[in-house]
């Protein structure tokens, strides 16, 4: 796992995409003991609120590594965003990261008592977005949960996928896309092992959460060459069955995190992705 951290750290230090938009005000604070960076869009009075949870398989990633991306979201969506520096596994195992996310969420809810929050995250951060929102719903705060925006999120542990889903061929992306994306099947297994959550715990496998039908709105996006493709499809289908308003964009041929690869060949794809993402955030927040 240390090798993964070293490789990704080198990549993130070499490439800074998108470039940080310095017109967005950023302030570092400690909320309830948790490092948090607060991004405020320029020239917007009383902007909507969102929490952002970075990617990294619960074992790596940081506020700094996704600073440029969150600044872009803040400005385009005209939303005040709180980026959460939650503790990482394996040093801090489940549910410590989730506890940090909930601490920041509750702090923001107390600071802005008349506003609801949109929960945004990518990959493992998408899992944190669902889990934080659903925990607040379970705690009777569903009216303060505006919705979830999850990009290629983990929604279920492979060991907790139902036999019916497997028999119908609805969970095959771990095998089909194993060598097509950075988050290979073996890498995902390592991430789950380090995180240490029981496979059937609904705070990890949010697809199984009893409060799923109480979410307000959900937007998701994923590439169909991603191992997490079927996590998104299963969550989409579950939300539809529960009559939760959901929108989902799928990108044929694209792997995990293609929206942030610094390649000129991906400019058209990334323009489409960011346009759809902006529409999704605005739809959830309206």
Swiss-Prot record:
The keyword Disulfide bond does not apply. Gene3D superfamilies: alpha/beta hydrolase (3.40.50.1820). GO terms for biological process: sterigmatocystin biosynthetic process. It comes from the Eukaryota. A motif (Involved in the stabilization of the negatively charged intermediate by the formation of the oxyanion hole) lies at residues 54-56. Disulfide bonds: none annotated. Induction: The genes forming the sterigmatocystin biosynthesis cluster are co-regulated and induced on oatmeal porridge or the fungal isolates were grown either on oatmeal porridge or in YEC medium (0.2% yeast extract, 5.0% corn steep liquor). Expression is positively regulated by the cluster-specific transcription factor aflR that binds the palindromic sequence 5'-TCG(N5)CGA-3'found in the promoter. It is an enzyme of class 3 (hydrolase). Pathway: Mycotoxin biosynthesis; sterigmatocystin biosynthesis. Keywords: Hydrolase, Serine esterase, Virulence. It catalyses: (2S,3S)-versiconal hemiacetal acetate + H2O = (2S-3S)-versiconal hemiacetal + acetate + H(+); (3S)-versiconol acetate + H2O = (S)-versiconol + acetate + H(+). The keyword ATP-binding does not apply. One of its GO terms (molecular function) is carboxylic ester hydrolase activity. The active site is at residues 123, 226, 256. Its EC number is 3.1.1.94. Signal peptide: none annotated. Belongs to the 'GDXG' lipolytic enzyme family. Esterase; part of the gene cluster that mediates the biosynthesis of sterigmatocystin (ST), a polyketide-derived furanocoumarin which is part of the most toxic and carcinogenic compounds among the known mycotoxins. The first step in the biosynthesis of sterigmatocystin is the production of hexanoate by the fatty acid synthase (FAS) units stcJ and stcK. The polyketide backbone is assembled by the non-reducing polyketide synthase stcA by condensation of the starter hexanoyl-CoA and 7 malonyl-CoA extender units followed by cyclization and release of norsolorinic acid. This is Versiconal hemiacetal acetate esterase stcI. It comes from Emericella nidulans (strain FGSC A4 / ATCC 38163 / CBS 112.46 / NRRL 194 / M139).
């Amino acid at each position: 796992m240390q090798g993964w951290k070293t490789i990704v750290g080198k990549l993130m230090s070499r490439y800074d995409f998108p470039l940080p938009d310095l017109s967005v005000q950023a302030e570092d604070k400690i909320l309830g003991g948790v490092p948090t960076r607060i991004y405020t869009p320029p020239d917007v009075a009383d902007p909507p609120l969102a929490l952002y949870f970075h990617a990294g398989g619960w074992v790596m990633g940081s506020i700094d590594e996704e600073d440029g991306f969150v600044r872009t979201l803040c400005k385009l969506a005209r939303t005040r965003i709180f980026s959460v520096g939650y503790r990482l596994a394996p040093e801090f195992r489940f549910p410590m990261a989730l506890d940090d996310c909930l601490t920041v969420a509750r702090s923001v809810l107390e600071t802005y008592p008349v506003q609801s929050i949109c929960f945004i995250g990518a990959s493992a951060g998408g899992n944190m977005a669902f889990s934080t929102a659903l925990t607040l719903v379970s705690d009777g705060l569903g009216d303060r949960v505006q919705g979830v925006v999850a990009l290629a999120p983990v929604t279920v542990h492979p060991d907790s996928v139902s036999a019916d889903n497997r028999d119908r061929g609805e969970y095959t992306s771990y095998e089909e896309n194993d060598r097509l994306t950075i988050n290979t099947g073996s890498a995902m297994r390592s991430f789950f092992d380090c995180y240490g959550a029981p496979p059937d715990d609904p705070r990890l496998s949010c697809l199984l959460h009893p409060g799923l039908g109480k979410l307000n709105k959900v937007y998701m996006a994923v590439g169909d060459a991603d191992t997490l493709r079927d996590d998104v499809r299963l969550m989409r289908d579950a939300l539809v069955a529960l009559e939760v308003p959901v929108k989902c964009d799928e990108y044929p041929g694209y792997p995990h995190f293609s929206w942030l690869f610094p390649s000129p060949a991906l400019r058209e794809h990334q323009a489409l992705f960011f346009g759809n993402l902006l529409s999704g955030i605005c739809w959830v927040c309206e």
